[in-house]
């Protein structure tokens, strides 16, 4: 019988063996899933207060944390913040496949994945959004977040 807790932890490959997206890992079995999928690094876009990292995360993966605002705060991410996230992602990519997450993988982590597709793979913002919505159906960035993509 499958482990129900593990089956609820979703990991979607945006680009196979390059970039994956999903919600914050919260248990050791989530870390096992990341390792089983070949993930080498984790980029967190939420605060530790929003989603405390599970024990062992930093011992098992190369990790970076860059907190971006979401719908619960009074501002959109700034272009400089998105650029910082892309720089962190590029640095982590040198170690292998990267898992990008926020709390629920609806706004912030999809935004960074969209920006990666635009900047590193030459997709238009609309094409990147169409693609990401196919491979990661939970994608739901806010209009103000999407507007940043045109400024990359």
Functional labels for PLM-detected ranges:
Residues 6-10, 15-97, 118-151:
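Cysteine-based protein phosphatase catalytic domain of the PTP/DSP
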Residues 1-5:
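Non-catalytic regulatory/accessory regions that flank a structured catalytic core
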Residues 96-114:
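A phosphate-binding catalytic loop at a beta-strand-loop-alpha-helix junction
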